[in-house]
Amino acid sequence: MGRVQDRVAIVTGAASGIGEASAIRLAEEGAKVVCADLNLAGAEATAKKIEAMGLVASAYQTDIADSDQCDALAADTLKRYGSIDILVNNAGVNLPGTFHETSNEIIQKTLQVNVAGMMYLSRACIPQMLKQKSGSIVNMSSINGLVSEPFLTVYSASKGAVVMFTRGVALDYAKLGIRCNAICPGWVDTPINYAHADLLGGLKKVYDGISSFQPIGRPGEPREIAHLVLFLASDEASFITGSVISADGGMSAM
């Protein structure tokens, strides 16, 4: 028996990076995984990787910034699989730049995807979790939700909001069987970080000097974060709710 055997998991941002790794890791431990992403081809590719292992997955195109699409994702998941046990709110955008030059469009998109989208989908899934008297929500924040960096003012603000959203949901539903926790990754080797790296002089320069801000001396790998997602989603974390866990190679210890 897997650690999340026969549970139904929705993973957003499942086309690549941490979302892809989390979808695969949950499936490896027995979950039926809905791979949701705006990029349908990417979501389908992740689902096919899971199915190739003889496991259960499906792909779903969703723009989480659209509340109606979030409602549809939850409803269709319930119709197809009969429950919603795990929600991994991983989808996000990082559009770095100098703050006073940041357009309204970038501010709105960042907040709509990183904050409102997470709220929309959680709101859509929680009623079923309440009926089941069980559920685990894992929100992907960032180390930049705790400490900021140059060019990340708007992104950091959005990820800080994720931290407080996580704590609020945890408190609202702690006695009703639903747990909610957040993960704050450090610099992980995923496409979402590449634009920021360009502003810092390029990916090679960042990785050559990574020990200066990430003491472990290397970028994280998506699967390393996925292991933590699995733990928080499983019964092994049954006493953990409202927690904000850094997985940052020592960055926050500096």
Question: What would you call each of these model-derived segments?
Answer:
Residues 88, 174, 179, 240-242:
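Short, small/polar-rich loop/turn modules that mediate ligand/substrate recognition or access, typified
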Residues 122, 158, 166:
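Active-site helix of classical SDR
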Residues 142:
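Residue(s) in the substrate-gating loop at a strand-loop-helix junction
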Residues 147, 229-230, 241-254:
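Short C-terminal tail/terminal secondary-structure segment
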